[in-house]
Amino acid sequence: MRQAGIRQWDDIEPNPPPLLNNWSYFWEDIYNAAVDAREAFANGNLQFFTQNLKPSDRWRLLHLKLNQTTFIDIETSGLESLDNYITTIVAFDGQKLHTFVKNENLEDFPDFLLTLKLIVTYNGSTFDLPKIMREFNLPNIPVPHVDLRWLCHNCFLDGGLKNIEKTLNIKRPEDIRGTDGNDAVILWNQWANSNDHNARRKLVKYCAADTISLLLVARKLLEIHHCDNVPDDDGDPWRALDQIPQSKTNQTTPVQNETCNTQHSINDRLKAFLNKKRRH
């Protein structure tokens, strides 16, 4: 098609160019697909492209919408158990970290998800997103999604996110460079069971680092595909980790939160019962 002068949707006319006359019998489908794609892009319907582009071609969405992309990672209470639960979710929009922690504000995540344009994960198709759907009882993920694992695979980059980082020379801050998913489980237990605020902060920081790494990997992939006009990098994205507050001694542990919530519920029911008795 390039030899026929077709490089973008607007170059596709109702009739095929002379060089592609042998495509006449299915040209109408090509033309209609181009019309649909133009309309979807004009309307900001990115779901159209995640549904119609091959996984290996979805890097094109990153090229066009990187500044509207949110990078998401989750941590769970265990790596193998089927009944594990989400402990932490971090979302990074390239500027700001959005943190959701169990028994604090994790239940706010579904509403936050609805505000996003495009989400990116690493291996999220088989891990993060099914976990999110199960945790929040969602029938589907209501936001277009790109899984960097498969984009990396098509660039001959395989393995976990840490292996990809090594290959692409992406270096995490030293204090979390050796931390992995197993450590995240231990850190959660230290926070939940022992009120270890430093463990909570390191857990959130580790999860946040994964999301920042996703942005850096995405940029490297766009370089591999020789993309131009990529949105400018606003300095060192690792500086976003400074947004994570220092540990606060007045924070309640998850167990304390549950106790407080239970007590509030009991108090509310007791007040309702007493008010009802007064009316009678």
Regions found by a protein language model. Give the residues of each.
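DEDD superfamily 3′-5′ metal-dependent exonuclease/proofreading module
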Residues: 1-280
